[in-house]
A protein has these predicted regions:
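Glycosyltransferase specificity loop/lid
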Residues: 1-472
């Protein structure tokens, strides 16, 4: 029977895309394995793979009940899909030599299913080692206090391998231990520690110190840490996609033609992922900052949430049919048309970052965006919004020096026009911190290229985990 590896991502496009890249990588370098990826029927935004090395199995699913928080939905879908998954894995095991199941954190409900079938389970951590350190240390933090992180406010948490992290900067779903989401995350962290191994979308050169601390067991002081395999960066190979999703087209996006006419490394790109929405007031402030900076820019703008009281971001799709111009200062588009372009909702992020005219990136610090930027050698300004992005920001700014920070209002986490103008200008033209960041990101890019090359650290890690599966 053919040696088979099954991948089971949660129904989030970014997770599916990254898991597909892992499957392609396995199929390319270890063709002895048959790769099957199981997708829930809820994966409506799932990209299509034409890789001959990957078999896609669509799993029927039972709709989960409405969740109080948006981020609970992937957990709930996996929990309500366990019986279907059990049948699918049993069917695969009856005709193939099933060596391992690879899941992500949101599909954690699959862990006991695989254990009952005697299938070794590996977690694929789609973010970086900095966020992984937080997740692995959560059970320890949970046992050290009875308070929720939201009640600890700006109290500093000491997580091995990371700069000091404010309790308020922990991933959003961890803020209140009374939330169902918190319980799901805590269970996922505990299961991850008990798994056969953790595959991470990073590389040794980018996060060497944090990876070393994790491997030494400092994040999990009371139990053995599972084997860690840094196999990244895994960047979407179909370059007309981005981390945030969106419709793609065979026709070249107009923003790329505009970039063709701009000087080398002169344009700052602003893009905030699929859920990054700002209030109308913040959009106007951002526009004013870009105008004051005098820097060339390409700005992807999503309409603000319909709830005018929203102060920062929302995952809502409401308002997508609204004109962007109404949220800009009067005359802004006309005054900046010679040096700026505003794109509604979506742009081909990987192609933009890889364009020779782009010299900077204002990002929400989503991990896919970070590794895409570093892989392209583009320095960043960090503007974290949700999920684990504040942890990623701490790594980018304080540890790796690959991004400049933004000062935010204590009241509503807004950024002033002057602050954005100052940091964008420093990133693109500055001789101080901006120059350091520009130089550091080019060095980090070289490290990534080396890690992915034959004999590089990521290839060695992939071979190491594959060797475990071969031994079975």
């Amino acid at each position: 029977m053919k040696e088979t590896i099954v991948l089971y991502p949660s129904p989030l496009r970014g997770h599916i895309v990254s898991m597909l890249e892992l499957g392609r990588l396995l199929g390319k370098h270890h063709p002895r394995f048959s790769i099957i990826i199981i997708l829930s029927s809820a994966s409506t935004a799932a990209p299509v793979t034409n890789s001959s090395s990957i078999t896609v199995l669509h799993l029927s699913s039972t709709a989960a009940p409405a969740a109080a928080e948006l981020d609970q939905t992937p957990f709930d879908l996996a929990r309500h899909n366990t019986s279907n998954l059990r049948l699918a894995l049993a069917a695969i095991a009856s005709t193939a030599d099933l060596r391992a199941l690879i899941i992500d954190g949101f599909s954690d409900a699959a862990f006991p299913v695989a254990a009952a079938l005697g299938v070794p389970t590996y977690y694929y951590f789609t973010s970086g080692a900095a966020a992984l350190a937080v997740f692995l240390h959560l059970p320890t933090l949970h046992g050290s206090t009875t308070k929720s992180f939201k009640d600890l406010g700006d109290e500093t948490l000491n997580i091995p391998g990371l700069p000091p992290i404010k309790a308020s900067d922990m991933p959003w779903g961890m803020h209140d231990r009374s939330w169902r989401m918190y319980g799901y995350l805590l269970d996922a962290c505990r299961n991850m520690i008990s798994s056969s191994g953790i595959i991470v979308n990073t590389c040794e050169s980018l996060e060497s110190r944090i990876i070393r601390v994790i491997k030494e067991g400092l994040c999990v002081p009371d139990r053995p840490t599972p084997p860690i395999f840094a196999v990244g960066p895994l960047v979407e190979s179909k370059v007309d996609g981005d981390e945030g999703g969106g419709d793609t087209t065979e026709r070249r996006h107009e923003c790329l033609s505009w970039l063709d006419s701009q000087p080398s490394r002169s344009v700052v790109f602003l893009c905030f992922g699929s859920q990054g929405r700002f209030s109308a007031a913040q959009l106007k402030e951002m526009a004013s900052g870009l105008e004051r900076s005098g820097v060339r820019f390409l700005w992807v703008v999503r309409p603000p949430p319909q709830d005018a009281s929203a102060k920062s971001t929302s995952g809502s799709n409401d308002g997508d049919d609204t004109s962007i111009e109404k949220f800009m200062p009067e005359g802004f588009l006309e005054r900046t048309r010679e040096r700026g372009m505003v794109v509604k909702s979506w742009a081909p992020q990987i192609q933009v970052l890889s364009h020779q005219s782009v010299g900077g990136f204002v990002t929400h610090c989503g991990w896919n965006s970070i590794i895409e930027a570093v892989h392209a050698g583009v320095p960043m300004v960090a503007w974290p919004l949700y999920a684990e992005q504040k942890v990623n920001r701490a790594f980018l700014v304080e540890d790796a020096a690959l991004a400049l920070p933004l000062s935010m209002s204590d009241e509503d986490r807004s950024v002033s026009a002057d602050e954005l103008a100052k940091q964008v200008t420093e990133l693109m033209e500055g001789s101080g911190e901006g120059k350091v960041v520009r130089e550091r990101v080019l060095a980090a890019r070289e490290g990534m290229v080396e890690a992915l090359s034959d004999g590089g650290s990521s290839q060695v890690s992939l071979a190491a985990v594959a060797a475990l599966w071969k031994r079975g």
